[in-house]
Amino acid sequence: VGRAGKGLAYMFTMMKTARLNVGIEGHAVAERAYQNALAYAKERVQGRDEADGSDDVAIIRHPDVRRMLLIQKATLAAQRALYLRAAALTDFAAACPDNVLRKEAERELDFLIPIVKAWPTDNGVVLTNLAVQIYGGAGYVEESGVAQYLRDVRITPIYEGTNGIQAADL
C-alpha cells in the first residue's frame, strides 16, 4: 500500500485530488443550472419591455434577470480559469523531471486547492439559487429540474472537508 510512516502524506495527496474534483462538481452543477436558467429566460414571456413599452417580452429582457444571468456567467468563467490552473499544476507536478520546478508547482497547488474547493462550491450554491430565482415559482417545483440542482450543489461545501474548517489549510 506504500511505505511505512507515509500514510498521512499519501492521504493528503488523495485529498488534494478529491477537493479539486469537488470544486469542479460545485462549478459543474452551477453551470448546468445557469444554462437551464438562460434557456428558460429566453423563452419565458412575462411583463413589458421597459425600453419600448411593448407587451409580452421574454424575461431575459428584464434588467434584474439579465443581472442575475451576468453574475452567473462571469463567476462561472472565473471559476473555470481557476480550476483549470489547478488541474494544469497537478499534471505538471506529477510529470515534471525538474525537482525545483516540481516543488514550485506543488507549493502553488497547495495554496490553490482550498480555494478551488471552497470558492466554486460556496458560490455554486449562490449561483444555483439565482437560477431558481430566474425561474420564479416554477423554479421551486420539481418539474423544472432546477430545484434538484440546488439540492445537488448544497452538499459540495460540506464533503471532502467542510469549507469553513478546511480554510485553516490556507
How would you describe each model-predicted region?
Residues 1-170:
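Internal glycine-rich alpha/beta core junctions
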